A protein has these predicted regions:
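Conserved tyrosine-mediated DNA breakage-rejoining catalytic core shared by Y-recombinases
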Residues: 5, 13, 25, 71-130
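Helix-turn-helix-type domain boundary/helix-start signal
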Residues: 4, 24-25, 99, 145, ...
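Catalytic-site neighborhood detector that most strongly recognizes the C-terminal catalytic loop/helix
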Residues: 25, 90-94, 192, 199-223
C-alpha cells in the first residue's frame, strides 16, 4: 500500500489469534520444598539475613487450599471466616465459594490473625482498630494498614529469588503466587465439574485453563 502496489489492505478483518497465557504452576515437590523453606525462614528474626516475612507461608496455604488469587488473599477480612470454612470472595466474574476448614488452613488463618494483633497492639503504637469486621483485613502491613497487592507481589519475588539462590528450587521449578491457584484446582479431587465448583468458575472453559491434570481413562472394549 505504501508504494502503490496494493489498493486495499488484505489484512482488514483478520484478527490476531489469542495465545494461551503461560502458567507457572509448582510441581508438588517444589511446592512442598518452598512452603517448608518459607516456614523455616519466617522463624528467623525479622530483617535478619536470609529471613522472610512470616505471612508468606500462611498466604501460600490459603492461596492453594482456597484456590485464591493474590488480590483475593489480600482482601480477606474477618467476615470471611465462617464456622465451617472460608468464604472465598472471588474476582473476574467467578462465583463465591465456601471452602471447608482443614488443619493447615486453620493454622494459616490463626497465624495471620496473631501477626495482625501483634502489629495493631505493639507498644507505643496508637493504631485505631477498625470496628466493622469487613474493615479488619487479615493481611496487613507493618504500619497496620491493609497490605497492597503490589507489596505482596514484591515480597514474593524477593522470597522466590532467595529460594533459588539457596538451592531450594531450580530456575525451571520457579513458580508464581498465582500458580498456587492452578495447583489447588488441579489437585482438587473429582471430575471437571467438581473442580469447576471448587474454583467458582462460571464456564468449563475457564476451569480447563487451570486444571492441568492428565485424565486417566479406561481403554475401549472390543465388541
Amino acid at each position: 500500500m505504501r508504494v502503490g502496489l496494493c489498493r486495499s489492505n488484505p489484512a482488514i478483518g483478520v484478527r490476531q489469534a489469542r495465545e494461551a497465557k503461560k502458567h507457572r504452576m509448582p510441581t508438588p515437590a517444589a511446592f512442598d520444598k518452598v512452603l517448608t523453606f518459607a516456614r523455616e525462614r519466617a522463624s528467623l528474626m525479622p530483617h535478619a539475613k536470609g529471613s522472610c516475612p512470616s505471612y508468606l507461608a500462611p498466604v501460600m496455604v490459603l492461596a492453594y487450599s482456597a484456590r485464591l488469587r493474590g488480590i483475593e488473599v489480600c482482601t480477606l477480612n474477618d467476615t470471611h471466616k465462617q464456622p465451617t470454612g472460608i468464604h472465598a470472595q472471588r474476582r473476574k466474574g467467578s462465583r463465591d465459594t465456601l471452602i471447608e476448614w482443614d488443619p493447615e488452613m486453620i493454622e494459616a488463618w490463626d497465624l495471620l490473625v496473631e501477626r495482625r494483633t501483634a502489629i495493631w497492639t505493639k507498644n507505643g503504637r496508637n493504631f485505631a482498630v477498625p470496628i466493622k469486621a469487613e474493615d479488619r483485613r487479615l493481611l496487613v502491613e507493618q504500619t497496620g494498614n491493609p497490605m497492597a497487592k503490589s507489596s505482596l507481589d514484591s515480597a514474593w519475588q524477593r522470597f522466590i529469588k532467595l529460594a533459588m539462590r539457596e538451592g531450594i528450587i531450580s530456575n525451571q521449578e520457579r513458580f508464581s503466587l498465582h500458580g498456587l491457584k492452578h495447583r489447588g484446582i488441579t489437585n482438587t479431587v473429582g471430575n471437571r465439574g467438581d473442580k469447576q465448583d471448587a474454583a467458582g468458575h462460571v464456564t468449563p472453559e475457564m476451569t480447563g485453563r487451570y486444571d492441568h491434570a492428565l485424565p486417566v481413562v479406561k481403554p475401549p472394549r472390543r465388541s
